[in-house]
């Protein structure tokens, strides 16, 4: 910095709150003539606690020894310490080396004021390298606290936040002309080179840092992806290489394996590739099964009978959302009709479309849990105590069709539903008792439509052919029309299911037709035990796995509850033995002898029906 003209110039710093900055005092600077000097190296400390500090200037070698004012200045303030403008120091800190143009109050007399008034940023060659030693080396230096500087210079220093420079120091330097060429061009270049490295870091305290996203934990049951063919080869060869070179690093082993893989024959590579393809197929299968298991994690279990009736608790929604295209409206206007229940033993192999009676069209599904007391031991042992009830429709009387059943689409990959005798008997007991408490536990697959107040018995005792009806007292009438299907009877319920309800009155007649053999034509087989009462006829489509759809008509009549049916027994007339599980005779006979006798009886009956007068002997 150069003071031209050799005149006595005064630097006035206003501020009554500190003795160094009082307005009454003026700092008398010595007359230096035309000499040029540079401020010694100053380093900029970014510590917010050192927001404002005094700058130490060393002017020992630059002072005029013949000046009389030099002695008084040294006696009063010390030769080594000269309090340079505080605003200038803060301007250096705030602007990254440039002076604060508006917040510095300087009264420069004579030629200095006229030369610098048009360009407020004063150009000073300040190599900022070591400011700490100059600041901390002199104990007599004082600092101004934050509030004083804010009130005096109009600076904002809140929260230790350093404002970014409004104008780059290069622009300030380039737009500020040096009045008397006091700064060397080399010094300016050095200053510009040092500025980018010395810029202070802008600290933003107002913004909150975003929390890092938590990665979802991997399910240990999820199948692992198969590795590549090269990875399989790496596993096989890594142990051998490690055995030969125990001190080899992983990088060295990788290089050796890579070279071995490159030199490997195509046929040997194909072996690893085939292993990878097989593992990939297994992975895709396991992944599909895993996803299906995740979508429908339903467990069916039986509960103990609760003698205390409780209020109906809301049932959970079905496993898969119902199709909105075919909603079945709920109906509660069936006081005189029996409940239509189809019992199924699969776990969760269908999607339920249930009558929408709740707010927002959400499906309301009533669960029916058959208690352990009503389940025979054969059910608990064979089916594991798992019972699934397919919800059927509740219909109004006088033949009004209410809606379609809430049976849903069974995917081809899902297991077909198998209707068993023991499950049907359990459903019959549940429907007859009508004293089931509201369910305590409600597994999703166990579903049934709301029950009407009448007591009814529903029995479907149809296993694979030959068709056999349950023994029932006369008040109960069951008519089943079912085409013969290859055993065992595996059926799908195909959407949209066709369900009709009609009301008929039948005369009190009893008809019976002989049982059909296994290879009989698909004629309707009817077993009737009727009474002159209203009949609820339910028609549903039952489709086997491979065969074409067949129609099953079930007519249910109102009447008194019927006792439980006996345990399954051999099909041959007169044999009371339970059937033996065998694929040769469709699990319907107890032995080979019963199979032969039954076939002989059926054949003799057929011959007798065609020619009553002839007598046929069969060996």
Swiss-Prot record:
Biased composition (Basic and acidic residues): 183-193
DNA-binding region(s) from the entry: 223-291
Region spans: Disordered: 155-227, 306-335
UniProt feature, compositional bias: Low complexity: 320-335
Motif (Nuclear localization signal): 213-218
Subunit structure: Component of the PNUTS-PP1 phosphatase complex, composed of PPP1R10/PNUTS, TOX4, WDR82 and PPP1CA or PPP1CB or PPP1CC. Interacts with PPP1R10/PNUTS. Interacts with FOXO1 and CREB1 (increased by cAMP); FOXO1 and CREB1 are required for full induction of TOX4-dependent activity and the interactions are inhibited by insulin.
GO terms of biological process kind: positive regulation of transcription elongation by RNA polymerase II; regulation of transcription elongation by RNA polymerase II; RNA polymerase II promoter clearance
Name used for this protein in its record: TOX high mobility group box family member 4
CC annotations in GO: chromatin; chromosome, telomeric region; nucleus; PTW/PP1 phosphatase complex
Subcellular location, record wording: Nucleus; Chromosome
Domain of life: Eukaryota
Lineage: Eukaryota, Metazoa, Chordata, Craniata, Vertebrata
Record-linked SUPFAM superfamilies: HMG-box (SSF47095)
Biased composition regions of type Basic residues, renumbered to the chain: 208-218
Phosphoserine carried by residues: 178, 182, 315, 531, 548, 550, 558, 560, 565
């Amino acid at each position: 910095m150069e003071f031209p003209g050799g005149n006595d110039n005064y630097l006035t710093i206003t501020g009554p709150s500190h003795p160094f900055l009082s307005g009454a005092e003026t700092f008398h600077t010595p007359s230096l003539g035309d000499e040029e000097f540079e401020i010694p190296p100053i380093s900029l400390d970014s510590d917010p606690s050192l927001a404002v500090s005094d700058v130490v200037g060393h002017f020992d070698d630059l002072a005029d020894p013949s000046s009389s004012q030099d002695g008084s200045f040294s006696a009063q303030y010390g030769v080594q310490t000269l309090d340079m403008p505080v605003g200038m120091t803060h301007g250096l800190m705030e602007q990254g080396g440039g002076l604060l143009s508006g917040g510095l109050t300087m009264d420069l007399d004579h030629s200095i004021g006229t030369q610098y008034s048009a360009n407020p940023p004063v150009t000073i060659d300040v190599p900022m390298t070591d400011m700490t030693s100059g600041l901390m080396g002199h104990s007599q230096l004082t600092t101004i606290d934050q509030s004083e500087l804010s009130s005096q210079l109009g600076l904002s220093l809140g929260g230790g936040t350093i404002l970014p420079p409004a104008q780059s120091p290069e622009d300030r330097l380039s737009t500020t002309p040096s009045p008397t060429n006091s700064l060397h061009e080399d010094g300016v270049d050095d200053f510009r080179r040092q500025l980018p490295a010395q810029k202070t870091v802008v600290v933003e305290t107002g913004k909150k840092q975003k929390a890092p996203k938590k990665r979802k934990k991997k399910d240990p049951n999820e199948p692992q992806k198969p590795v590549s063919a090269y990875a399989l080869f790496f596993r096989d060869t890594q142990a051998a290489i490690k055995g030969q070179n125990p001190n080899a690093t992983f990088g060295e082993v990788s290089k050796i394996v890579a070279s071995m893989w490159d030199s490997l024959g195509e046929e040997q590579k194909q072996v690893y590739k085939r292993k990878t393809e097989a593992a990939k197929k297994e992975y895709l299968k396991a992944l599909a099964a895993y996803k299906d298991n995740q979508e429908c994690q339903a467990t069916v279990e039986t509960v103990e009978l609760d003698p205390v009736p409780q209020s109906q608790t809301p049932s959970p929604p079905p496993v898969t959302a119902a199709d909105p295209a075919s909603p079945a409206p709920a109906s509660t206007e069936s006081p005189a009709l029996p409940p239509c229940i189809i019992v199924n033993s699969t776990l969760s192999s269908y999607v339920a479309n249930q009558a929408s009676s709740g707010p927002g069209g959400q499906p309301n599904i009533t669960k029916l849990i058959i208690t352990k007391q009503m389940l025979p031991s054969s059910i608990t042992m064979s089916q594991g105590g798992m019972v699934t009830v397919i919800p059927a429709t509740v219909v109004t009387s006088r033949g009004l069709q209410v809606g379609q059943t809430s049976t849903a689409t069974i995917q081809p990959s899902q297991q077909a539903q198998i209707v068993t005798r023991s499950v049907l008997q359990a459903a019959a007991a549940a429907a007859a008792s009508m004293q089931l408490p509201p369910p305590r536990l409600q597994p999703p697959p166990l579903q049934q439509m709301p029950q009407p107040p009448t007591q009814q018995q529903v029995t479907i005792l149809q296993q694979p052919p030959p068709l056999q009806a349950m023994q029932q007292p006369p008040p109960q009438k069951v008519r089943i029309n079912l085409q013969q299907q290859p055993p065992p009877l595996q059926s799908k319920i195909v959407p949209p299911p066709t369900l009709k309800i009609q009301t008929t009155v039948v005369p009190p007649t009893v008809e019976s037709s002989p049982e059909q053999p296994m290879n009989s034509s698909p004629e309707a087989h009817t077993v009737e035990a009727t009474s002159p009462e209203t009949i609820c006829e339910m028609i549903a489509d039952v489709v086997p796995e491979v065969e074409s759809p067949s129609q099953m008509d079930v007519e249910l009549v109102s009447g008194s509850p019927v006792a439980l049916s006996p345990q399954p027994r051999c099909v041959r007339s007169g044999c009371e033995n339970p059937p033996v599980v065998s694929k040769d005779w469709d699990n319907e006979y107890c032995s080979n002898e019963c199979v032969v006798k039954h076939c002989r009886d059926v054949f003799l009956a057929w011959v007798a029906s065609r020619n009553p007068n002839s007598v046929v002997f069969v060996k």
